[in-house]
């Protein structure tokens, strides 16, 4: 009898399945690689392990803090980072070089209560050498704080208007002063003789401020000088106490309403018929002034 031979088909079928599985995994890897490559181009990140996630997470919080930081905090940080400002703040707080760390004890609490400051929590700023703000305030004398408060609450000067005020900062508007010609002591200056009280000494009486004395003739205002040919004639007439045409008639004190006026022209009285012809020739003539001479007061004759 012959024995049946075993089938070889099952082992061959297993080999085919193995090749198919390898091929499927290879294709899946290629597809995943292509997907990651496409996502990287679009801006996504593909991580193969979770070990790199904490590193990225540690870098992100500082960026978020900078974005969410307030402008006031930035200003305070810039002020504190500057060395000159830090020194000024230390001087304001009244710290000394020999002071160490602040000792939190009951003795400090009792001393603060004795000084008049209420109980508070001790605070330390700008390093360990800086004392507590409330303690430094209590150590200062009250006069200094009162002076500062008075300066902060001082009233504005006249002519200033407050436009904007925030805390100690104040924006004021100063009005322009137009009295530039005044001195610092407030007395105005005289720019011209005619504008103020300053007048020439000679023109005070001519303006009407003074009046002639009693018993004297009125003041005569002379006109421009006559030519030399008529100078002798006018001089002789003045010695005879007559008023020529070259003099302006004035009023006497005794008769203010009337004026003694002598007109020697063709319209006035003509003492002699040949006067106009002689004056036209330029010859000096002696006038016949009988009846035209004014009677002066006795005191004027004595002068």
UniProtKB/Swiss-Prot annotation:
The protein's matches in InterPro entries, at most eight in alphabetical order, are given as: RELL2, TNF_rcpt_RELT
Residues crossing the lipid bilayer are 15-35
Q: Which GO terms describe its molecular function?
A: collagen binding
Signal sequence: where? none
Query: In which residue ranges is the amino acid composition biased (Basic and acidic residues)?
Result: 148-158, 172-188
| Mode of membrane association | Single-pass membrane protein
Where is the sequence biased in composition, kind Gly residues? 194-212
**Where does the record say this protein resides?**
Cell membrane
Region annotated Disordered sits at 47-68, 135-214, 249-303
Residue ranges annotated as compositionally biased, kind Polar residues, are 274-295
Gene Ontology biological process terms, A to Z: positive regulation of cell-substrate adhesion; positive regulation of p38MAPK cascade
Q: Name one GO cellular component term.
A: plasma membrane
Tell me which UniProt keywords the record has, alphabetically.
Answer: Cell membrane, Membrane, Phosphoprotein, Transmembrane, Transmembrane helix
Subunit details = Interacts with RELT, RELL1, OXSR1, PLSCR1 and TRAF2.
State its role: Induces activation of MAPK14/p38 cascade, when overexpressed. Induces apoptosis, when overexpressed.
Official protein name in the record: RELT-like protein 2
Q: What species does this protein belong to?
A: Mus musculus (Mouse)
């Amino acid at each position: 009898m012959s024995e049946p031979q075993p089938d070889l088909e099952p082992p061959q079928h297993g080999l085919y399945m193995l090749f198919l599985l390898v091929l499927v995994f290879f294709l899946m890897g290629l597809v995943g690689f292509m997907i990651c490559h496409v996502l990287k181009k679009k801006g996504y990140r593909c991580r193969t392990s979770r070990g790199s996630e904490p590193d990225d997470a540690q870098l992100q919080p500082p960026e978020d803090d900078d974005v969410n930081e307030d402008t006031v905090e930035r200003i305070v940080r810039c002020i504190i980072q500057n060395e000159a400002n830090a020194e000024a703040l230390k001087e304001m707080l009244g710290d000394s070089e020999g002071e160490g760390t602040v000792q939190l004890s009951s003795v400090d609490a009792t001393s603060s209560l004795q000084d008049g400051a209420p109980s508070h929590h001790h605070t330390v700023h700008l390093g360990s050498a800086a004392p507590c703000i409330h303690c430094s305030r209590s150590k200062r004398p009250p006069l200094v704080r009162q002076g500062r408060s008075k300066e902060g609450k001082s009233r504005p000067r006249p002519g200033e208007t407050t436009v904007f005020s925030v805390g100690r900062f104040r924006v004021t508007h100063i009005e322009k002063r137009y009295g530039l010609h005044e001195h610092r002591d407030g007395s105005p200056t005289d720019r011209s003789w005619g504008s103020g009280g300053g007048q020439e000494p000679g023109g005070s009486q001519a303006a009407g401020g003074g009046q002639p004395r009693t018993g004297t003739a009125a003041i005569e205002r002379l006109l421009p000088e006559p030519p030399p040919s008529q100078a002798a004639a006018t001089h002789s007439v003045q010695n005879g106490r007559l008023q020529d045409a070259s003099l302006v008639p004035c009023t006497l004190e005794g008769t203010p309403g009337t004026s003694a006026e002598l007109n020697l022209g063709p319209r006035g009285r003509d003492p002699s018929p040949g006067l106009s012809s002689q004056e036209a020739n330029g010859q000096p003539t002696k006038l016949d002034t009988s009846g035209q001479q004014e009677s002066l007061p006795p005191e004027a004759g004595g002068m």
